[in-house]
Regions:
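A composition-driven signal for long, intrinsically disordered, charge-rich low-complexity tracts
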Residues: 18, 22, 31-35, 69, ...
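Membrane-interface amphipathic/juxtamembrane segments adjacent to transmembrane helices
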Residues: 24-58
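Membrane-proximal, non-transmembrane alpha-helical segments
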Residues: 78-142
Length: 142
């Protein structure tokens, strides 16, 4: 029983540290992004790799923006571009998607912090641990 409590405390500590770190990093990068938008900060391209990694950890899906531009001779090129690949772009639609992505990441890490202290979460985790392990390892649950 003593070892179970030690393992549980270690898992709880790791999860709290991971979620708190993610939440604080989200707030930090969101402030850097807002400073960049107002012209008071450095170029945001420096932070694009860590922000992309943060969004991946928070399971934020990559938003796409439709792009139409004239290429000449009466022709138009259309494409979908990733917002995360164009973070430093100050277009209104890009900024809106970025702010929404920061809010989603903040919510994900906040939810994780709250789940750490919920007994129902841990009970559910114990009951569904085999299926979660299979999902994590990429094994089909069928």
């Amino acid at each position: 029983m003593k070892y179970f409590l030690i393992v549980f405390a270690a898992i709880l500590s790791y999860r709290v540290a991971f979620c708190l770190s993610g939440y604080l990093r989200t707030i930090y990068y969101e402030k850097k992004y807002n400073a960049y938008l107002t012209g008071k900060g450095e170029i945001f391209t420096l932070y694009s790799a860590p922000v992309r990694k943060l969004f991946k950890q928070a399971k934020v899906s990559t938003p796409l923006i439709a792009l139409c531009e004239p290429v000449g001779f009466g022709k138009i090129r259309t494409a979908n571009v990733s917002v995360f690949d164009n973070m430093a772009n100050k277009r209104q639609d890009t900024v809106g998607h970025m702010m929404n992505s920061f809010a989603q990441a903040r919510g994900y890490f906040r939810m994780g912090l709250l789940e750490c202290f919920s007994p129902l979460y841990w009970i559910q985790m114990i009951f569904f641990l085999p299926s979660k392990l299979c999902e994590f390892l990429g094994v089909s649950s069928d």
